[in-house]
Swiss-Prot record:
Gene for this chain: CHORDC1
Protein name: Cysteine and histidine-rich domain-containing protein 1
UniProt-annotated binding residues for Zn(2+) 4: 179, 194-195, 211
Modified residues (Phosphoserine): 51
Function: Regulates centrosome duplication, probably by inhibiting the kinase activity of ROCK2. Proposed to act as co-chaperone for HSP90. May play a role in the regulation of NOD1 via a HSP90 chaperone complex. In vitro, has intrinsic chaperone activity. This function may be achieved by inhibiting association of ROCK2 with NPM1. Plays a role in ensuring the localization of the tyrosine kinase receptor EGFR to the plasma membrane, and thus ensures the subsequent regulation of EGFR activity and EGF-induced actin cytoskeleton remodeling. Involved in stress response. Prevents tumorigenesis.
Stretches the record annotates as Disordered: 62-81
Keywords of this entry: Acetylation, Chaperone, Metal-binding, Phosphoprotein, Repeat, Stress response, Zinc
């Protein structure tokens, strides 16, 4: 019976009777995420693409391992003393402070207002980085070698969740079991968009067997630019809201950020062929004329001036479920 190997970066099934000392190619280290770069602590290769990170071939050979790594156990908090409910209640008067209501109360502008391109401010660090890239882009001969139809032995399959490598002509007839969706990491949970088997353990996520069968993809055929996720966050002051998108070497001539009083559309092209897109229905109202974008070598900052100096409960306006309930109540 074939068993699943739980070595990091492997995820293949193996026969215990034929398991040898060099049957498994895996990563003995741990995954490392730093400044939008992803890699393994045991090797030097880094990438910003999560799918490319998952397809990094292991750097160590050894035996397949069928033992599932233990998940991190949360510490159990126990108390030896039994206290009455009256003792557990706080001995002070509680004050519940509600978040400010959305700005719809002050006549929220229509989302159909015309969009305006925000001013782009390009930093000196980005200009220097782009100049260096232009000089290095002259060496296109190395890229031409990658465009050849010849597949090298040991090339890893580019399909998500597949860890098979090219061994020869027999690999062309082999069935590929892979994930047709994209990897998603949200609030500590990791899963594929195509099957949504969620887990908080990274090793378990890497070992998830694919949900789709097809042919291996030994070479990437990029039809132009591809949309990829980017790490981004936001913060606010009394008068401004700032969104930071961590995309390196963005191209100002191909990027744009447009907005009206309540909507924000972000389109960033970075690292030559990658795109990041985000459409945000803003929680509050902004002053478009006093808002701008700062582009640096490591990130893009979108600074939006608030129309009123008030705290936003969140960046995006939540779905209007309450409004739908109110409509149902009035019709009853």
């Amino acid at each position: 019976m074939a068993l699943l190997c739980y070595n990091r970066g492997c995820g293949q099934r193996f026969d215990p009777e034929t398991n040898s000392d060099d049957a498994c190619t895996y990563h003995p280290g741990v995954p490392v995420f730093h400044d939008a770069l992803k890699g393994w602590s045991c090797c030097k290769r880094r990438t910003t693409d999560f799918s490319d990170f998952l397809s990094i071939v292991g750097c160590t050979k050894g035996r397949h391992n069928s033992e599932k790594p233990p998940e991190s156990v949360k510490p159990e908090v126990k108390t030896t003393e039994k206290k009455e409910l009256s003792e557990l209640k706080p001995k002070f008067q509680e004050h519940i402070i509600q978040a400010p209501k959305p700005v719809e109360a002050i006549k929220r502008p229509s989302p159909d207002e015309p969009m305006t391109n925000l001013e782009l401010k390009i930093s000196a660090s980005l200009k220097q980085a782009l100049d260096k890239l232009k000089l290095s882009s002259g060496n296109e001969e190395n890229k031409k070698e990658e465009d050849n139809d010849e597949i090298k032995i040991g090339t890893s399959c580019k399909n998500g969740g597949c860890s098979k490598t090219y061994r020869g002509l027999e690999s062309l007839e082999e069935v590929c079991v892979y994930h047709s969706g994209v990897p998603i990491s949200h609030e500590g949970m990791k899963y594929w968009s195509c099957c949504r088997r969620k887990t908080s353990d990274f090793n378990t996520f890497l070992a998830q067997e694919g949900c789709t069968k097809g042919k291996h993809m030994w070479t990437k055929k990029d039809a132009g630019k591809k949309v990829v996720p980017c790490r981004h966050d936001w913060h606010q002051t009394g008068g401004e809201v700032t969104i930071s998108v961590y995309a390196k070497n963005s191209l100002p001539e191909l990027s744009r950020v447009e907005a009206n009083s309540t909507l924000l559309n972000v389109h960033i092209v970075f690292e030559g062929e990658k795109e990041f897109e985000q459409n945000v229905k803003l929680w509050g109202v902004i002053d478009v004329k006093r808002s701008y974008v700062t582009m640096t070598a490591t990130k893009i900052e979108i600074t939006m001036r608030k129309a009123e100096p008030m705290q936003w409960a969140s960046l995006e306006l939540p779905a209007a479920k309450k409004q739908e309930k109110q409509k149902d109540d009035t019709t009853d």
